[in-house]
Amino acid sequence: MNPTSSNLLLLGIGGSGAAMVRGILRAYGPGVRALILDTDAKSGGSTGDIPFVLLGGNRLAGQGTGGQPTSARAAFQDNPALLDAELEGIRTVVVVTSLGGGTGGGATGELLKHLHSLGIVTLLFATMPFAFEGAERQRNAKTAAGPIEQHADVSVFLPLDDLVADAQTDIMGDALQRAVDTMATGVTLLWRILERPGYIRLDAERLRNILMGCGRAHFATATARGPNRASALLASLAEMPLLKRDESSPPVRSILIGVLAGDDLRLSEIAEISSGLSAAFGEKATIELGTVNDEATFSGRLSTVVLLFEESATSTRRGLDKDAGKPQSMGERSLAGNSRFRHTDKSTWNDEDLDIPTYIRRNLTLDR
């Protein structure tokens, strides 16, 4: 596959995002269309193997933000169109980053806002700081999450404490690498499902339709071997902190399940995984399923990728017209959330929607 032919893009923002992209490419191999954005010129690497866009070159001289999110936000706002040449033909972007620091925390919301303005659907994976990193870094991450959730179609926030919960080492460098590897493995499995679909297809265009305006999600992967591998896989998922839920958790609206195996994949295994996840996370939730049969990669093992999409207010705030795939106008967004008029016809005259205030309809600026 020619990576430049795909309408699916992997985009890492900030130093951590760049590291995640490189980890995913190592795990997947050739065939992933990727891009790195950062305020630090060193993230581009010396080989030029991955397209790189430097943010805020005139403002920051390629030296990074020094951990200041406001500097990263301003750097992106200087020239949002800087990356548009790399977005030609792109319909869906998977964004990976880390929150709590400078570039990831400050520029990711602006990036997602820009992608949304172009009609590009976005799935975001963002790591959240360790608890021991302190209140300020935690606060910065939560502050960054607000605009991210507003502009991303789907947001997956991954606490680093949960990513390393099953690590077999206490060495910090090894634990951090474990976190990157865990996230890279999950995104890599998702990429295989999209780009190498099996008998039950889940391709990039179907994913785009599933993701559009969904809001917050939870994400996990698991792998098992042996005669009872489907049961073992479900047991592993049940113990994962990334999928932990309690009485305060919003209901699960839908579950995306990717099943990856060799030629020995059985229908009974697919049924067991699907019914097991449905029973665990909500029998009323809709199921979206895709499979990959890849004997060379998955011989003897069974892997799964799970995305749980929650019922939340976030999805109703996303101003995306699902029929047209384009951003809605301000007036359309305001009316969409008004339940009084949800099931009534629009009032139109000369092709103008009279339910939308005149100053919005005609783009008039009001004196204050």
PLM region spans:
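Tubulin/FtsZ superfamily GTPase core signature
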Residues: 1-368
